[in-house]
Structure formats: structure tokens, C-alpha cells
Amino acid sequence: MNIIWHGHSCFEITGKDGTIVFDPYQANSVPGLNSLKLKANLVLCSHEHDDHNARNCVEVAPKDFKVTCIETYHDHHQGSHRGKNTIHIVDFEDLKVVHMGDIGCMMDDVSKLKNCDVLMIPIGGYYTIDTKEALKYIERIKPRIVIPMHYRSHEFGYDVLSTNEEFIQQSSSVTYVDDCLEVNKDTKKQTVVYKKPRN
């Protein structure tokens, strides 16, 4: 399985099972990122904000996948500030992939997320959980591969978001890749930081 990062919270996973796109962003919704034009068999959007719901930017050839959805909140106030958020758990090539979307709360029960192969988790704060909260989730979920998302870089992102620097400093076994990560059953436990988005 290959995991391509298109910036912000948008990932494309591809393999023999097909292609799934998570949280594509609308044109001009994320400063510094160009509009998307992708192809997939399934598009999964965690919520309906423009930086996560650009289904119109993905040409879809439908195919069935095993997907589990967990409803959570986009804030610490049971959704009263920013609404609901959906966590997607995908069974892809016998790997358990979890995309946390724009989660902004701490869940009491993470049993369905535990021991996943890949965890994509926001770290930028303000709109979502921050680095401190993300690290608490990671400790509880115990994923094999952690991919931080929804943060600010020098080239793109919202000014109110934190960068990934604090997260990197507090993470172990950090690996840097360009814009694509190959994952299989033998991939070692690590935190993966993409050097740049494919955009």
C-alpha cells in the first residue's frame, strides 16, 4: 500500500485493492495549496468544511471497501462550536488504516482504534486537538505507524495552526519521506513526516 500526502489532511491510499482519498480540500480553502484533481474508488470526508469535503475534485469509479465510521466532535464542546467529526477506519490490503479527521475532543473509548497499522492524526491545534492531545491518543491507541496532519508549514496552512516541530521533538523513531510512503505488514513501528505534499 502506498500513502500519498496531498497536504493538510488529504491522503490518497493506493494498492491492489484500489484507491481511497481522505478529506480532499476545495480550491483556495487552504493557503498555499493548489486545487486537487484526483481519481479514486472511494472518497471519505470527515466533515463538511471546505478544507475537507472536495468530493467534486475527485473522479470516482465506485468500488466497495470495508469502512467503519465513528462519530466524534470537532471541538471540546460536544460539537456546539464546530460540529461533528467522523473518524474513518478502513481495512485495506489487510492493514487497518485510521484517519481521525478534524477531531477536537478526547474520546473515552478508543478500543476500535487500538493497534491499527496506520494512524493519521491532527496535531495543529486551534481547530483540532494539539500535539499534547495527539500524543495522548497515540499512547492509548498504540499504532504501528503515526502520520501527523493538519498543521502549518512554511509553505502552506492556516496561520493559527502550530507547526509540526513540537510533535517531531516529542516523537520517537521519526522517518522522513518525500510525498509517498510504502506500507506493508513488515513496515517497522515509526512516526512518518512527509517533506512536502504532492500538490
Which positions does each model-derived feature cover?
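Core dinuclear metal-dependent hydrolase active-site scaffold
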Residues: 1-42, 49-118, 126-133, 176-199
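Proline-aspartate-enriched helix->loop->beta-strand connector
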Residues: 40, 118, 134-151
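Accessory terminal helices/loops
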Residues: 144-145, 149-199
